[in-house]
Amino acid sequence: HDALPISGLLDFLIFKVDNRVEDVNLYGDIYIKKIIAGLLKKFLIGCQNMMRECIELEGSGFPVPARYEDIKNMVRGYLGFGNKMGEGWLLTGEMLELIHSGVSNIVCTQPFGCLPNHIVGKGMIRAIRENNPSANIVAIDYDPGTSPVNQENRLKLMLSTVKRVLREDSPAGSVAGNEESSSLLIHDNVI
């Protein structure tokens, strides 16, 4: 069983540091912030590169995560880099990274009524689907007041779409009841 790509904490840390650089670029903040944030970003990207090299060399079966700058470039045309509420543009970038790496079925969970992630996450799903017709993305809220039945129904609806697509793409009868081959990935966003 191949491991599926899941973004790590390091991308989020680089994103937070990079936001300080973008603040200076977009809003004209204190220039020393840009220098310090730039140095920290360079250090974190160096750590990411070492991690990528180790994963490649070890042959562990884990996919090598995309570079932060590659994820950032995927977002161009979707969102501006000044959009940093919640996970900001990174959430959209993570979904695009999954799609580009072959994962077309994504469950985007939104815990605790996080309004920024609702806006950015759910708001970008339509644009992502328009540019990536094979994308099957569902956003599910996990709040104390959210009905588990609604959550389960959204997952069942998504799985029915997966089954339909697999039937259309496969020889007759070869997909019956085989949800495991659908490359479903549950993606958990926690802020």
Which positions does each model-derived feature cover?
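Short, conserved secondary-structure transition motifs
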Residues: 8-23, 145-150
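Active-site rim loops that border cofactor/substrate pockets in soluble metabolic enzymes
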Residues: 36-92
